[in-house]
Amino acid sequence: MPPLASCTVAVIGLGYVGLPLAVELAKHQECVRTGEPLRRRVIGFDVNTLRLEELRAGHDRTREISPSELQAATGLELTADPALLAQADVFVVTVPTPIDSAKRPDLTPLEKASATVGRALKQRRSATTPVVIFESTVYPGTTEEVCVPILERESDLRFNKGFACGYSPERINPGDQEHRLT
């Protein structure tokens, strides 16, 4: 993987977790340690085109991000085009995991996102090893038992050989303006 300062990061799912993360990554275009400019690119991917239109107009219906914060995220490219994901070095999956009527997690959004990322991995032309990070709230074992097999099937790559994978859940309280990601 190239250094984080110059890699392309794709955030998949621009809801309560993904949008603040994408904005934060995109607004820091200078290394805090050295002051040198960063060459990092951030792709914000969502399948909801209405959501993307609202964000482009400076409106976040979740109220997690202000219009000025959206405007300051100059390195953020919003898209619903999965083909652009093939340009990423790091994939951060932040899709929702709602529960069904029996209070079981519905992994459908996570499975669909994993398949989308897997197809992007297959289309990549970079020699660097891509990293896929799951931040969706799931039960133990989901990454290894559900997500990784989908990534392998869709990409024709093998875990820890063709791509790396990890899990890092975000702990946020939607609507809490005092305790935010940053």
Question: Language-model features: where?
Answer:
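Dinucleotide-binding Rossmann-like beta1-alpha1 core, especially the glycine-rich loop
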Residues: V93, A164, R171-T182
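Short mixed-charge
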Residues: V32, P37, T62-T74, E154-A164
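Solvent-exposed alpha-helices and their adjacent loops that cap or buttress functional pockets
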Residues: P2-L4, L70, L157-F159, E178-L181
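A structured beta-alpha segment of the ubiquitous adenosine-cofactor-binding alpha/beta core
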Residues: I65-V90, I99-D100, G118, K122-R125
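NAD(P)+-binding Rossmann beta1-loop-alpha1 motif at the extreme N-terminus of oxidoreductases
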Residues: M1-A57, E77, A83
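Redox-cofactor binding/interface segments in oxidoreductases and associated redox assembly factors
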Residues: F91-V93, F134
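Rossmann-like NAD(P)(H) cofactor-binding subdomain of soluble oxidoreductases
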Residues: I99-R171
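A general structural motif
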Residues: S6, R39, A88, A127-T129, ...
